[in-house]
Design a protein with these regions (language model features):
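Nucleic-acid-processing active sites and adjacent nucleic-acid-binding tracks
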Residues: 170, 212, 405-426
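Gly/Thr-rich phosphate-binding beta-strand-loop-beta motif of the actin/hexokinase/Hsp70
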Residues: 382-407
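Extended hydrophobic-aromatic, low-complexity segments
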Residues: 229-231, 246-247, 399-400, 412-415
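Phosphate/NTP-binding elements of NTP-utilizing enzymes
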Residues: 2-390
Length: 426
């Protein structure tokens, strides 16, 4: 298929048909993103090209491996997300100076430059959806297929966490499964004085992963603005940007430097977090405005998976809204165990709701269940065994004595005696 401004993308078309048939359940945010994609299809100024996405799929399935060395077979969701990046293009009219053939003088001509539409992709999806593997595929593709010299970075709240993007690439280099990687890894990295033909062309070094044919580099950077601003990177992946207590807008810092390149790409992947009022919440508010149409930005792709309501946690058939790869990269049994754990161990409830179902909750723990906070009638406890606890503080300030009376039904009666000194009272 050549460029078309009317064609429906292949993998999005298959996904949309499955949604309309009721085979795939989607939440409100994904539904709004589908409306945005339908708007791109109807826009005559935006063009779809299937060659790039099919080339990406062919490269991944012929050359790449999983972290453990098994052959990689792209999930349907990977194809859907990658199609948004590689499938859409638009043309920009530019006036370019062309010298005359004899070298004397010249003139300006108008040219149409083809540019990739999507510069940023946000992927908010539950834990266990292989999102880091997706980011690794994107980085690997640009590192080894893009013939220009690219500087690529990956960042995460910790440096070791960012290695999750690098690890599958290192495994693919070691395995050298396909013809391209066999060629790139042929030779020895120690051969620095002999023929360049006998040197390895792709290797993991102390800098990162280097492609010596093009001079391209993929490296890990710490997730703070000081280490990320001013970079002229062409491709950047940001992992778990909602999970940590991140108070800086690192995605904005990366974009300011990356925008020096005409076709930069930033892929930000994360599961929902439990830390509120950080930069991640501000970004999510912006994404919500884009999805609702309050703020038009066709250069951003948003795949925001979550349950529509906390009531759906008890409905296993709705869990696919939060993790479309459920049953492929993570089992239903794992989810069921976490649901049971959230019911039996309330301290873990917020984290499970956020990480497994995309429901933003504040805080990490709470001590009392709802039932334990309900008021009880006043009771007296006399001539019963008890346990005594005392908080003597500084002795001259505040003292508290608490008596716990074990009851026959497994609960405890509580009595407290609290005292302050006359000095504190004054």
């Amino acid at each position: 298929m050549a460029l078309s401004n009317t064609a429906t993308p292949i993998y999005y078309g298959q996904f949309r048909d499955a949604v309309l048939r009721g085979d795939i359940l989607v939440n409100q945010e994904i539904s709004m993103e589908m409306n945005r994609i339908d708007g791109l299809i109807a826009n005559p100024g935006v063009w779809y090209d299937d060659e790039a996405i099919n080339g990406f799929i062919s490269f991944c399935e012929n050359e790449l491996t999983l972290t453990d060395g098994e052959d990689l077979h792209l999930l349907d969701t990977f194809k859907l997300w990658a199609e948004q990046i590689f499938g859409w293009y638009y043309f920009v009219e530019q006036s370019v100076y062309e010298p005359e053939p004899d070298g004397h003088g010249g003139h300006y001509v108008t040219k149409y430059i083809k540019k990739r539409l999507i510069n940023k992709q946000f992927l908010i999806i539950a834990r266990g959806a292989a999102k880091s593997m997706y980011g690794s595929c994107i980085q690997n593709y640009f590192l080894n297929v893009d013939t220009s010299t690219t500087h690529q970075i990956t960042t995460a709240p910790t440096m070791k966490q960012a290695e999750e993007i690098m690890s599958p690439i290192k495994t693919a280099i070691t395995r050298s499964r396909g013809p391209l990687f066999k060629f790139l890894t042929e030779g020895s990295i120690q051969n620095t004085t002999g023929s360049k033909a006998n040197r390895v062309k792709l290797a993991s070094t102390k800098k990162g992963i280097e492609n010596f044919l093009t001079g391209s580099l993929l490296e890990v950077r710490p997730m703070n603005i000081d280490k990320l601003q001013g970079l002229r990177c062409k491709v950047a992946t940001v992992d778990e940007w909602l999970s940590g207590d991140i108070r800086e807008d690192v995605i904005g810092a990366i974009e300011q430097g990356a925008s020096k390149n005409p076709d930069y790409l930033i892929v930000a992947m994360s599961s929902e977090g439990t830390v509120r009022n950080g930069s991640g919440d501000t970004i999510k508010m912006e994404l919500a405005d884009i999805l609702k149409g309050k703020y038009v930005n066709p250069h951003v792709s948003i795949w925001w998976y979550k349950l529509d309501s906390i009531d759906e946690v008890s409905q296993p058939d709705k869990w696919i809204k939060a993790n479309p790869n459920l049953g492929k990269t993570v089992s239903y049994e794992t989810y069921q165990l976490d649901v049971d754990r959230a019911e039996k161990a309330p301290a873990n409830r917020n984290d499970i709701l956020a990480k497994r179902f995309g429901i933003p909750m504040e805080g990490y723990t709470y001590y009392f269940t709802y039932e334990e906070t309900l008021p009880h009638r006043k009771r007296d406890f006399w001539q019963m065994p008890c346990a005594l606890g005392a908080d003597l503080s500084q002795g001259d300030d505040f003292c508290a004595f608490t008596f716990l009376f074990p009851l026959s039904n497994g609960s405890f009666g509580v009595k407290t005696r609290n005292y302050i000194s006359s000095l504190t009272l004054k």
